[in-house]
Amino acid sequence: EHFFSGLKEGTFVELGALDGLRFSNTYIFEKAFNWRGLLIEAETENFFALERNRGQGKNAVTLHAAICAEEKLLKLYGTGPEASINRDSKMIKAGKVSWAPCLRMEDVLKRSGIDNIDFLSLDVEGAELETLATMDFGKTPTFVILVEMRKVDEGSNPKIRKHLHEHGFCRF
């Protein structure tokens, strides 16, 4: 009502899309409002679930990747919702390691044909600031950004807020 009232055919990007259903911030936009978008998930098992749950739809494209300043392979620790690039994270369970391609956001958006974002959902387990820093908001206008910030990330929260404020966003 406050942000998207009357908006038809919106565009979303969800980074850290998990399985596309559990904790999804974009599912309702796709299914109830016919929005189109991009679902990005780095952890392999989560991505396979994302493909099963949302990959067959006409409105969403899925991508197995993380977002970085430069292309590389990224090592992830743990599985499920707590998978993280930080192996010292208090949230992950020891043991499992996986790898994901890390791509530049500008390249991903260009390949996906996305030139504006109405809703960006960001839940990347401690890599929020690094991910936001790769975005060129001048090239890809973005209307609303939802950033998940956990108590364990308190040190980065003010930096994220400052970064977004410097790019014209306000906290709501």
Task: List where the protein language model places each region.
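Phosphate/nucleotide-binding beta-alpha loop and adjacent structural elements of enzyme active sites
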Residues: 1-172
